């Protein structure tokens, strides 16, 4: 391949709407082109990277006995009606009717298709366990596509589905898949990806992990304990806080004119937000019924946990007179009947605190939950905070980081096999529902994530295992016959030896050539110039500037192949 005929223009500057480094560099470098919101075409370099990542994934899935299959992108709505997700998933699932008026969907995941494929093919316990997987296009109508390939609407994903006859067997396979993911990310050049406990969301199941690339630009919040290694997505993390023991005070109603926020009322009463209770109001989407969450004044509601607790989608409440509550002065004592009330565990040991009195311009101080409200049920619905207590080791060591989710794994249980009536005949001659696991990796997002953590000011620095080419040959002052002869020979020799090589033989300045080479991010570079040939050598260097050497033009292939093997070995994990 020659740079002169490589489609895709390279730019000095990125468009103003690029929000992440990876997005800017991939646009500047001629990797991707936007077609519409969250929709991208791939030029050759990006496609080659994607194919290499897919091959790594394929090798690791085959290594744990995966069977590669292919599902359709378009599925009948009736299939999703079987599982219940046709109505339970919102507008991110793209629905349409075909010419015959039949409801159809564009697949955003393929659990339904996997069960439909397997339920008529795996009727006996002797066929279990098994795992099927595909690497294929998905469409999710994201409301906030952004960041280039970080969050798109159409994307390529590896999705795998395993089927088991026991929970123990699922857990054993889940561990294998977990290890396979570690190998995939290590081989792709991002061993810093970590697994975190996660919320299963619409996928269902009780056990799930997300694989996160820790980076400041990540959209996900990660809760980490550096003391014991506990890691969780904030959506699934428990918030455990310590409450000070305050002197017991009598319950007293106090006048707090126009003090409607926690900050206002605490300043007015000379109290800390840690000694206060705040109310956060929601309404259920289905009927607009009111939900009030009470938690310690310095904390925030974990809306994922709240949604899971109440099994309902919700939105921020719009308070109306008919609700019977006093906005800005709402508290747990004296609420009207018929309101769903959730008490966070942060209030369980809090005493002598400030709370709304459910009366215009009044608050209580000196409130005590047990004394003033009696026995109530507490739930964990607050977001974990930095400095909080680790749920595993019990130390005040929680830190908060950001991350990009590049993969996920779930123990689904029988959610889909039961709803879609997939059964097998067990050894005791009874019909049972298989237990499922599912395992996903976003290919495009992984490309962008690698670029996000492996670049400099000049362009991407692709790991050797996924780079679009392994070596770039640059011929400087190609009009020089000696330069042309040597550079052409090096290029042809490397090609014949099976090295993936791209050749820049354009008659351009060294500055432009090296700038384009940096944007292509090829990990190894050979420079042939009159200056190097004066010393009967060519320059051999790495894109990351970790090494640089002169090579004898007659011994290029052996040296280059040895270096490639060394770099690949450095990214290959031990079994």
Regions found by a protein language model. Name each.
Residues 1-98, 156, 161-201, 298-299:
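TRNA-binding/sensing appendages of the translation machinery
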Residues 459-513:
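Generic long, charged, amphipathic alpha-helical segments
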Residues 491-559:
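C-terminal structured "cap/appendage" subdomains that terminate the fold
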Residues 87-104, 213-224:
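Acidic, His- and aromatic-enriched active-site or binding-groove loops in soluble protein domains
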Residues 265, 437-466, 470, 565:
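C-terminal, non-catalytic macromolecule-binding modules
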Residues 38-43, 156-165, 210-212, 406, ...:
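Short, hydrophobic beta-strand segments
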């Amino acid at each position: 391949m020659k740079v002169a005929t490589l489609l895709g223009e390279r730019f000095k500057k990125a468009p103003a709407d690029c929000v992440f480094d990876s997005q800017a560099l991939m646009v500047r470098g001629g990797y991707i082109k936007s077609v519409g919101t969250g929709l991208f075409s791939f030029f050759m370099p990006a496609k080659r990277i994607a194919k290499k990542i897919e091959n790594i994934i394929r090798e690791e899935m085959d290594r744990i006995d995966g069977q590669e299959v292919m599902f359709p992108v378009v599925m009948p709505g009736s299939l999703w009606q079987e599982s219940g997700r046709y109505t339970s998933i919102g507008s991110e699932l793209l629905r349409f009717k075909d010419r015959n008026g039949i409801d159809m969907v564009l697949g955003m995941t393929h659990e339904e298709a996997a069960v439909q494929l397997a339920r008529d093919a795996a009727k006996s316990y002797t066929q279990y366990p098994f795992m099927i997987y595909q690497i294929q296009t998905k469409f999710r109508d994201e409301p906030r596509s952004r960041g280039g390939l970080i969050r798109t609407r159409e994307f390529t994903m590896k999705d795998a589905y395993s089927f088991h006859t026991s929970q123990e067997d699922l857990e054993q396979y889940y561990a294998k898949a977990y290890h396979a993911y570690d190998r995939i990310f290590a081989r792709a050049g991002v061993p810093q990806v970590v697994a975190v406990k996660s919320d299963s969301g619409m996928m269902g199941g009780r056990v799930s992990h997300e694989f996160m690339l820790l980076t400041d630009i990540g959209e996900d919040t990660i809760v980490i304990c550096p003391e014991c290694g506990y890691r969780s997505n904030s959506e699934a993390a428990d918030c455990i806080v310590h409450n000070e023991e305050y002197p017991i005070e009598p319950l007293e109603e106090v006048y707090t004119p126009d003090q409607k926020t926690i900050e206002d009322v605490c300043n007015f009463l000379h109290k800390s937000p840690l000694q206060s209770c705040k109310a956060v109001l929601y309404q259920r989407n289905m009927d607009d019924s009111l939900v009030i969450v009470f938690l310690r004044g310095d904390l925030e509601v974990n809306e994922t946990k709240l949604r899971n607790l109440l099994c309902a989608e919700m939105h921020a409440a719009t308070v109306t007179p008919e609700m019977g509550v006093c906005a800005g002065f709402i508290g747990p004592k004296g609420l009207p009947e018929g309101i769903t009330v959730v008490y966070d565990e942060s209030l369980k040991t809090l005493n002598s605190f400030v709370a709304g009195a459910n009366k215009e311009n009044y608050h209580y101080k000196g409130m005590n939950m047990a004394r003033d409200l009696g026995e109530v049920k507490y739930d964990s619905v607050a977001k974990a905070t930095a400095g909080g207590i680790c749920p595993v080791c019990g130390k005040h060591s929680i830190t908060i980081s950001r991350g990009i989710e590049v993969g996920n794994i779930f123990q689904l249980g029988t959610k889909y096999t039961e709803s879609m009536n997939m059964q097998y005949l067990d050894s005791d001659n009874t019909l049972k529902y298989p237990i499922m696991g599912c395992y996903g990796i976003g290919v495009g997002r992984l490309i962008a994530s690698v670029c996000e953590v492996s670049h400099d000011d000049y362009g991407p620095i692709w790991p050797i295992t996924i780079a679009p080419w392994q070596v770039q040959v640059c011929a400087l002052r190609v009009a020089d016959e000696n330069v042309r002869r040597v550079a052409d020979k090096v290029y042809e020799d490397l090609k014949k030896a099976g090295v993936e090589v791209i050749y820049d033989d354009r008659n351009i300045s060294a500055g432009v050539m090296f700038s384009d080479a940096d944007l292509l991010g090829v990990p190894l570079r050979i420079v042939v110039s009159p200056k190097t040939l004066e010393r009967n050598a060519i320059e051999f260097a790495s894109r990351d500037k970790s090494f640089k050497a002169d090579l004898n033009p007659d011994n290029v292939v052996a040296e280059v192949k040895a270096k490639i093997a060394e770099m690949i070995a450095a990214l290959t994990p031990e079994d």
